[in-house]
């Protein structure tokens, strides 16, 4: 039999298959990419066993667990674990701390003729490892921020770099008031775990300098890890510039045409277009206080007219009206103020091609220094 695993580095670098014995409610709060949840107990069973443990102690709780997961139910779950083990002979199982639940499942599998190793320390140990991974990267690596006005194409530039930490990608959110996607954001712990694994894999490839977008602490509903965010308040900044008309077209592409297509892909044609329109109206409503009554009313009317025309004919051209107004009257003044406050940290400014080449050259220089 393969030994139980203590090499968390290899687990995440090699995307080793793992099955999670925790209850669904635990799994939903936070897990690891690609892991399959095959719980020993469902949420209700876990709650009953937990209550019994508090009131009567461990022995009674274990007895209740065996009583609840017995007969056909036990056989059904055992078959699912066995199927995973046979499909992934190089994998592992784990529970919260690598304790009783892991041991029970290992024992039942052994009775069925399958010896399958566990992750020592379970979920908690792997989670701690990833938190440490993020903090070590913050302390040991070089970081540079990419900033710029809304619509300059920061994401487009980032996608052309090998050393990017895509906060918005990991958060499944574009970071602005209109940044929600057609699919849900990850749980906070999933966001943090995904970010840490991304850093771990890139560092294993020899990357010691990371580029990330100049974001606030909150990206939609996801919070940037504190150590990283504190560093972002002092990291050097590269500023991306582009013509106003180009920015309008890029926003039209990303936040209207492509986002509507996302909703249609997820929800179907009719519901997708309707839900897209509702999302856009809600996004505008979310900044009502910051816009002020008169400006909100005017831009909302332009948005409403554009959505009506888009839903009627598919023509998105009217969206340029509210996009231009929102940039000139809201986003650009806000970003101009922020740029002024960070002016001393800006080490380069240019268009998309210039910024991309500068960042690539910067990474090459850092790599030579590390060597």
Curated annotation (Swiss-Prot):
Belongs to the SelU family. InterPro entries: Rhodanese-like_dom (IPR001763), Rhodanese-like_dom_sf (IPR036873), SelU (IPR017582). CDD domains: RHOD_YbbB. Its EC number is 2.9.1.3. This is tRNA 2-selenouridine synthase. It comes from the Bacteria. One of its GO terms (molecular function) is tRNA 2-selenouridine synthase activity. The active site is at 95 (s-selanylcysteine intermediate). Keywords: Selenium, Transferase. It comes from Pseudomonas entomophila (strain L48). Gene3D superfamilies: Rhodanese-like domain (3.40.250.10). Residues 12-135 form the Rhodanese domain. It is an enzyme of class 2 (transferase). Involved in the post-transcriptional modification of the uridine at the wobble position (U34) of tRNA(Lys), tRNA(Glu) and tRNA(Gln). Catalyzes the conversion of 2-thiouridine (S2U-RNA) to 2-selenouridine (Se2U-RNA). Acts in a two-step process involving geranylation of 2-thiouridine (S2U) to S-geranyl-2-thiouridine (geS2U) and subsequent selenation of the latter derivative to 2-selenouridine (Se2U) in the tRNA chain. Monomer. It catalyses: 5-methylaminomethyl-2-thiouridine(34) in tRNA + selenophosphate + (2E)-geranyl diphosphate + H2O + H(+) = 5-methylaminomethyl-2-selenouridine(34) in tRNA + (2E)-thiogeraniol + phosphate + diphosphate; 5-methylaminomethyl-2-thiouridine(34) in tRNA + (2E)-geranyl diphosphate = 5-methylaminomethyl-S-(2E)-geranyl-thiouridine(34) in tRNA + diphosphate; 5-methylaminomethyl-S-(2E)-geranyl-thiouridine(34) in tRNA + selenophosphate + H(+) = 5-methylaminomethyl-2-(Se-phospho)selenouridine(34) in tRNA + (2E)-thiogeraniol; 5-methylaminomethyl-2-(Se-phospho)selenouridine(34) in tRNA + H2O = 5-methylaminomethyl-2-selenouridine(34) in tRNA + phosphate. GO terms for biological process: tRNA wobble uridine modification. The lineage of its organism: Bacteria, Pseudomonadati, Pseudomonadota, Gammaproteobacteria, Pseudomonadales.
């Amino acid at each position: 039999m393969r030994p139980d695993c203590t090499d968390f580095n290899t687990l995440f670098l090699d995307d080793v298959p793992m099955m999670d014995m925790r209850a669904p409610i635990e799994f939903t709060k936070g897990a690891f990419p690609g892991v399959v949840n095959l719980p020993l107990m469902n949420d209700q069973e876990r709650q009953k066993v937990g209550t019994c443990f508090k009131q009567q102690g461990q022995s009674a709780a274990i007895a209740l667990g065996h009583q609840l997961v017995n007969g056909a139910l036990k056989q059904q779950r055992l078959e699912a674990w066995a199927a995973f083990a046979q499909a992934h002979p190089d994998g592992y199982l784990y529970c919260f701390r690598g304790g009783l639940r892991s041991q029970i499942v290992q024992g039942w599998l052994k009775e069925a003729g399958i010896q399958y190793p566990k992750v020592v320390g379970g979920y908690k140990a792997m989670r701690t490892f990833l938190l440490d991974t993020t903090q070590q990267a913050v302390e040991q690596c070089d970081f540079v921020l990419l900033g710029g006005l809304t619509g300059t194409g920061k994401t487009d530039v980032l996608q052309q770099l090998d050393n990017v930490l895509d906060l918005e990608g990991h958060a499944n959110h574009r970071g602005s008031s209109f940044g929600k996607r057609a699919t849900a954001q990850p749980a906070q712990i999933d966001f943090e775990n995904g970010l840490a694994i991304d850093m771990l894999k890139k560092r294993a490839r020899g990357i010691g300098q990371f580029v990330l977008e100049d974001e606030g602490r909150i990206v939609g509903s996801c919070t940037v890890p504190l150590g990283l965010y504190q560093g972002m308040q002092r990291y050097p900044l590269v500023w991306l510039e582009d013509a106003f008309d180009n920015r309008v077209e890029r926003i039209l592409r990303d936040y209207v045409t492509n986002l509507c297509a996302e909703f249609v892909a997820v929800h179907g044609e009719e519901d997708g277009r309707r839900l897209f329109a509702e999302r856009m109206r809600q996004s505008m409503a979310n900044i009502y206080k910051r816009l002020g009554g008169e400006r909100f009313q005017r831009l909302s009317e332009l948005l409403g007219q554009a959505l009506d025309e888009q839903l009627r004919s598919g023509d998105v051209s009217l969206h340029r009206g509210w996009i231009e107004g929102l940039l000139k009257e809201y986003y650009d003044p806000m970003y101009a103020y922020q740029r002024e406050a960070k002016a001393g940290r800006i080490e380069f400014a240019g268009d998309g091609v210039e910024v991309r080449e500068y960042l690539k050259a910067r990474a090459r220089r850092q790599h030579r220094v590390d060597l």
